Amino acid sequence: MEQRLRIAIQSKGRLYDETMGLLTEAGVKMTSSKRTLLVPSRNFPVELLMLRDDDIPDAVATGTADIGIVGLNEVLEKDKAVEVTAPLGFSRCRLSLAIPQHTDYPGLNWFNGRKIATSYPVILRKYLNDNGINADIHVITGSVEIAPGIGLADAIFDIVSSGSTLVSNNLVEVEKVIESEAVLIQATGRIMPDIKRK
């Protein structure tokens, strides 16, 4: 059986679309990916492993996938034994702290004693600790931006692309913490095999 390079990618969404565009641009032709978790290439010894983005770092770290394409934000949050081998220049966003509009914001110390909702507690905790801020981190998945509006939190720490979701939820970005984009990752210390076109 032919050895194939297994690439873990996000199974849907913007990162999926842009990753497929990159592979197409590189000349990689895939078979249909409808409802299939493992999709082989028709012209390279490559197969795609379709996963949720937050599962990609673990799949690469454990050797389930040889390499992965995922947002830097997920690499930092999951803190697995992977290394970034190349930034890919697409799916750019940032992780930021945001608070309700019309809030008097004197600076980062505003967050002391406040409750912050996020899906990225590892990154947020490190940022707050590094800056001497003692806040309560409330972990939620999905729809983080509604937390202040329903009284669940005083602020949020979340992904921001255009900022329109913040505006529509009456929030304003006050601290840009990390710039993120799609990156190529491999397990720490792993040596990649040669990949030749069929």
Q: What is each PLM-predicted segment?
A:
Residues 1-198:
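Domain-level signature for soluble enzymes in the chorismate/prephenate branch of the shikimate pathway
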